[in-house]
Amino acid sequence: MIFLPTVIDKNIKGDRFLDLYSKMLKERVIYLNGAIEDTMASLIVSQLMFLDSENSKDIILYINSPGGVVSSGLSIYDTIQFLKSDVSTICIGQAASMAAVLLAAGKKGKRFCFPNSRIMIHQPLGYAQGQASDVEIHAREMINIKQILCEILSSHTNNSIFQIFKDTDRDNFMNCKQTLKYGIIDNVLYKKWI
């Protein structure tokens, strides 16, 4: 069981206790923590859509994730691109694989990481079993997904598709300065800026 701390929310109607995630959501802050899968994606997408329906002020998306299921991540990515609100992405800890794509998906100029964050990009991982024709179908789909992810990273980083394909051939780990140079983020959040 996960313990969620409660905080006091002060407003004109009086004080009330909120769990920490509800308080963060009220402040337009979402925390993506852990492996990206369908349940998490559904929660993140619904929070993004709710906040966007309230008003078009910026939404802050903190990311600490090893990545996960590509289709789940793409549902979050597509939602971010669809919103009227700008989404500021901030890596705290790690943004690997699909999480790195989401980090890059934030509004240009509003993508950050903390000094000790680690970012990793690579090609999608998958497996297939069954008849040879089924394995071939899945292999073609993996190549298609790789193309889509490389196009997304290219559009957000201004690196060529060729460069992205080359850089994602194997696990490619970057520190915050390398991530900034690569174009996945726009700035590093040092203590003096917080």
Swiss-Prot record:
Its main location: cytoplasm. Keywords: Cytoplasm, Hydrolase, Protease, Serine protease. It is an enzyme of class 3 (hydrolase). InterPro entries: ClpP, ClpP/crotonase-like_dom_sf, ClpP/TepA, ClpP_His_AS, ClpP_Ser_AS. Its EC number is 3.4.21.92. One of its GO terms (biological process) is protein quality control for misfolded or incompletely synthesized proteins. It comes from the Bacteria. The active site is at S97 (nucleophile), H122. It catalyses: Hydrolysis of proteins to small peptides in the presence of ATP and magnesium. alpha-casein is the usual test substrate. In the absence of ATP, only oligopeptides shorter than five residues are hydrolyzed (such as succinyl-Leu-Tyr-|-NHMec, and Leu-Tyr-Leu-|-Tyr-Trp, in which cleavage of the -Tyr-|-Leu- and -Tyr-|-Trp bonds also occurs). Gene3D superfamilies: 2-enoyl-CoA Hydratase, Chain A, domain 1. GO terms for cellular component: cytoplasm; endopeptidase Clp complex. GO terms for molecular function: ATP-dependent peptidase activity; ATPase binding; serine-type endopeptidase activity. It holds the Pfam family CLP_protease. Belongs to the peptidase S14 family. Fourteen ClpP subunits assemble into 2 heptameric rings which stack back to back to give a disk-like structure with a central cavity, resembling the structure of eukaryotic proteasomes. This is ATP-dependent Clp protease proteolytic subunit. It comes from Carsonella ruddii (strain PV).
